[in-house]
Swiss-Prot record:
Swiss-Prot/TrEMBL keywords: ATP-binding, Magnesium, Nucleotide-binding, Transferase, tRNA processing
Organism: Thermobifida fusca (strain YX)
GO biological process: tRNA modification
Name this protein carries in UniProt: tRNA dimethylallyltransferase
Annotated site location: Interaction with substrate tRNA: 105, 126
DNA repair among keywords: no
Molecular function GO labels: ATP binding; tRNA dimethylallyltransferase activity
Gene name linked to the record: miaA
Length: 319
């Protein structure tokens, strides 16, 4: 079975740039590569600035898949993403191309790469929990989750009502902890996972600079436009980092500067959770984000831990 490459790690560490550079390097070696998005918020149409979605120019001619597939009013569903991602992976393999999965949404990465089956839903249980979320707020439900499944609570942001509700729903339906539905790391495809890491002070600074750039690039105006398209009604998209804070500003619940400062704080907290998630996966090969030979080292990992480079060399000898 053909290999998948994944580039993972916390936000603002440089995953997208590395994925493009690595795809180009693979293509140069006769291994045409294409990129599959594994950032849950980049799946949404129009959420460009706040998700740091690469522009067409920044993609440097490398085909990208699973960007802009959902409207902002649609609730994210990891099982739907799993079906889409696996279909793209299988299509690329059939075409003789190398899939490069990139993103920091840990559950989405695992859904694409691993043997994971997601429990079904119970509309009555879901409706009751969503009503409790609306009445009590996410912090109260997160405290309940912490009592029932401490490991799941550590992995889910206390403000992420959607994921808290889903975890509580699974616990109620299955009678077991939510984390029991995430078994040991069993790969569906041969995979080389490359993780980018940065010292915390440097990553914190990169996050602050990124938020500054997003504001300068017009994030507030982007949110205003998406609000007209139904962003407030989107159960998932309205809670995205930056978007949730600006929606509060537009509603008069805080100042713009407070929204910006909270975006920085919330993003830093999220980055810590992302790194903790990926650190638990022993298959990830970690590289420093600022290594001067980063692309060379990433390509070397691909050659060392897969047969891709051997296949490329064999084709060269036969041609």
């Amino acid at each position: 079975m053909s290999t998948v490459i994944a580039v993972v790690g916390p936000t603002a560490v440089g995953k997208s740039d590395l994925s493009v550079a690595l795809a180009l390097r693979l293509t140069e070696h006769g291994l045409p590569a294409e990129i599959i998005n594994a950032d849950s918020m980049q799946l949404y149409q129009g959420m460009d600035i706040g998700t740091a979605k690469l522009t067409p120019e920044e993609r440097r001619g490398v085909p990208h898949h699973l960007l802009d597939v959902w409207e902002v009013t649609q609730t994210a569903n990891v099982a739907d993403y799993q079906r889409m991602a696996r279909a793209v992976i299988d299509d690329l393999h059939a075409a003789g191309r190398v899939p490069v999965l990139v993103g920091g949404s840990g559950l989405y990465v695992r859904a694409a790469l691993d043997e994971l089956d997601f429990p079904g839903t119970d509309p009555k249980v879901r409706a009751r929990l969503e009503a409790e979320l609306a009445e009590q707020g996410p912090l109260a439900l997160h405290a309940r989750l912490a009592r029932l499944d401490p490991e799941a609570a550590r992995a889910i942001l206390p403000t992420n009502g959607r994921r808290i509700v889903r975890a509580l729903e699974v616990i109620e339906i299955t009678g077991g902890p939510f984390t029991a539905t995430l078994p040991d790391h069993v790969s569906r495809y041969p995979c080389v996972q490359i993780g980018l890491t940065a010292p915390r002070p440097e990553l914190d600074e990169r996050i602050a600079l990124r938020v500054d750039r997003m504001w300068e690039a017009g994030l507030v105006d982007e949110v205003r436009a998406l609000e007209k398209a139904g962003l407030r009604d989107g159960f998932t998209a309205s809670r995205a980092l930056g978007y949730a804070q600006i929606l509060r500003f537009l509603a008069g619940e805080c100042t713009e500067e407070e929204a910006k400062e909270e975006t920085v704080r919330a993003t830093r907290r999220f980055a810590r959770r992302q790194e903790s998630w990926f650190r638990r996966d022993p298959r990830v090969h970690w590289l420093p984000y600022d290594a001067p030979d980063l692309v060379d080292r990433a390509f070397a990992l691909v050659c060392e831990h897969s047969d891709l480079c051997f296949r490329s060399a064999t084709r060269d000898e036969q041609s």
